[in-house]
Amino acid sequence: MSWLSKLMPSGIRTENTPAKKRSVPEGLWEKCSNCGSALYGPELEENLEVCPKCDHHMAIRARARLNSLFDPDTATTEIAAQLGPVDVLKFKDQKRYGERIKASQKASGEYDALIAMRGTLKGNPLVAAAFDFAFMGGSMGSVVGERFARAAEVALEVGCPFVCFSASGGARMQEGLFSLMQMAKTSAALGRLREAGLPYISVLTHPTTGGVSASFAMLGDINIAEPHALIGFAGPRVIEQTVRETLPEGFQRSEFLLDHGAIDQICDRREMRNRIAELTAMMMRQPHPQDADAA
C-alpha cells in the first residue's frame, strides 16, 4: 500500500484501488438486434418485445403472446398440456433426440414447441395456439401436430374461431415421417373447421418456414403477418444456391408477400389483439368489439 493510500479516506479510490463491480440482474437490459439500442427489460416486455426505438419485432415467448391475446383476469384452459414428445425412432445425430428433448424442455420450460389455449377475446370465446421458437426452433413433431388438431377440435365443439401464431423452422427431422404426417393431420383438422363454417386466422411471425409454411400456416381464411417476418418454404440462401441467381431485395419478407398477394394483411404486434377481435367478430357476425365494450 502506498503512503498516499494510507492518507486518503477509505471511501475515495486511488489509482491502485480496484473498482468494485456493480452487479446488474440478468435480463434487466436487452439489446435490440436491429438498431442496437439498449432496452430496459420490463419496458420491453410490456411493449410485447417490440423495440420502442425502431419498431423491430423481437422474439416473444408463446405464453406471453397468448396472454397478450386473451382477456386479462379471465380463466384460460390449456389444451393437451400433458402431451410430451417421445423418441420413437431412437434418432441420433450429434446428440440423441431424447437428450435434445430434455435440454429444450429445461431451457424453455415447455414440454414441446406449441401451446394451445381456450379463453375469451373481448368477451367472445376463442381458441388460440402459439409456437415457442425457443423449443428446438419451433419445429413441428407429433406433439405439435396433435395439440394443433385437438385445439381445432375444441374450437369445433365450442363453435368459435381458431387462431394460430406460427414461428417455426419446419418439420422436426428427428421424428422423420411422423413429423411429415403432421402436415396432413393439421390440414385435415382445418378442413373440418371449414366445413362447419368456423373461421381460422393464421398469424405468420418471424420466421415461418419449412413444413409449417407448407401446411396450416398458409391455410387461414385470413393470413396476417408481423412486419419484416421471414416467410417461405426454403430459406433465401438455399434458393440462391439452387437457382444460381440473386433474389430480389426483401424476398420472402412479409412486405414482399403482401405486395404479391401471398398474404392478406400486415399488423404490428401491439395492434394484433384488436385486429383479431375485429376480424373474428365480423366473421362470426358478432357485435363490433368496441360496441360490446361500450355496452
From Swiss-Prot:
Organism lineage string: Bacteria, Pseudomonadati, Pseudomonadota, Gammaproteobacteria, Lysobacterales
Residues annotated as binding Zn(2+): C32, C35, C51, C54
E.C. code: 2.1.3.15
Record's protein name: Acetyl-coenzyme A carboxylase carboxyl transferase subunit beta
Swiss-Prot/TrEMBL cofactor(s): Zn(2+)
SUPFAM superfamilies documented for this protein: ClpP/crotonase
Residues annotated as domain CoA carboxyltransferase N-terminal: 28-295
Alphabetized HAMAP family for the sequence: AcetylCoA_CT_beta
EC class name: transferase
Similarity annotation: Belongs to the AccD/PCCB family.
GO term, biological process aspect, one: malonyl-CoA biosynthetic process
Taxonomic source organism: Xanthomonas oryzae pv. oryzae (strain KACC10331 / KXO85)
Function: Component of the acetyl coenzyme A carboxylase (ACC) complex. Biotin carboxylase (BC) catalyzes the carboxylation of biotin on its carrier protein (BCCP) and then the CO(2) group is transferred by the transcarboxylase to acetyl-CoA to form malonyl-CoA.
Entry-linked PANTHER family: ACETYL-COENZYME A CARBOXYLASE CARBOXYL TRANSFERASE SUBUNIT BETA, CHLOROPLASTIC (PTHR42995:SF5)
